[in-house]
Every structure is written in structure tokens, then in C-alpha cells.
């Protein structure tokens, strides 16, 4: 996973990985089939290394769906500081791979739901936090897409310094954006 995180999908070399592991390059291809197969397995491990929505503390869960969403969004920076390797692999998989591999990644995310988004949305509906008249799959997709993209935007400055020039290093502005994002989502799907 580290090779992909440091060098990207295109830059990572199977030869380097095999050398570091002390095995033949052919062994990697025999097991994973291709570099894409190896990356896909690294992506899956990275996804399952991230916390699921409902792994928030009980006190947060007791406050409901939107409090839990807020809790995780406010902790987005830990993805870069504490768990940068898996998060970087996720970013590369989401934005830096070819369409065939991206299709496999999308199928994995839908079929395996590594973040537990379906269960999280059902939790919100059962509590009455989320409108019951909305299609469950639509709400799950919205939460997945919007939260993922928003988290990526929150860490963009960390990943690509200088991309955003205005309001740099203003944590209060970031906190306000997180709360505004949760409020927009609450107005869209909240009951």
C-alpha cells in the first residue's frame, strides 16, 4: 500500500514492491493477475482500514444521524495526519486510475459498503432523523458521494498546498464550512 501511496498508481513499480518483499515479480502477478489487481486489493484494504460511520462513540450516536456525520467530518484531518497511507490510496483510486479500475472500485464500494453507509442511513431513518419518503438507495448514494467529496475538499490544502489561496490557515472557517455542509444535507434529507 505504501508504494502506491508514495508514488501513485502510475508511478508505483511492481518490481520495487517485489524487491522489498524479497519475492519474484512473477509471484505478484501470479497472485494478483496484474498491477491493477494488486492496486485494487490495496484499495480494498485501505477502505476497510477507515472507520465506519457507526463506529462513532455511543454519546455521539445517541445524538443522532447528523451529529454523527458532523463528528466524522470534524475529524477528517486525522485521515491525512494519522492514516495518510490508506487515505492517499483511496484518493488515488478515486481520482487517479483508469476507467476499468475505477469501475471495479465503484462496484466494490456498492457491494461491500466498507464505510457502512447503508446501515448508517437506516440508523438515521429509524431514529426519525432522515425522511422516510425518500428512496433509501438514493439517500445512501447522496451521503456517500457528498461526504466523500466534501472530505476530499477539506484536506485539499494539506494534499496540494497553494491550491486555495484565500482564507488559508483559518480553522474557524473550516469549522463553519463543515457545519454549513451538515445543515445543507439536513435540509435536503432530514425529517
Language-model region placement:
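Generic detection of well-ordered alpha-helical segments
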Residues: 2, 44, 48, 52, ...
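Short coil/turn segments at alpha/beta junctions that flank glycine-rich nucleotide-binding fingerprints
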Residues: 6-7, 61, 83, 127
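C-terminal peripheral helix-coil segments that are non-catalytic and often amphipathic
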Residues: 78, 111-127, 145-191
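Short, charged helix-capping/linker segments at alpha-helix termini
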Residues: 10-11, 130, 134
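Short secondary-structure transition hinges
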Residues: 77-118, 122, 137-140, 166-171
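Helix-turn-helix
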Residues: 3-37, 41-42
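Hydrophobic alpha-helical connector segments
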Residues: 41, 56-85, 136-143, 175-178
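Helical hydrophobic small-molecule/effector-binding pocket
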Residues: 44-51, 67-95, 118-119, 144-157, ...
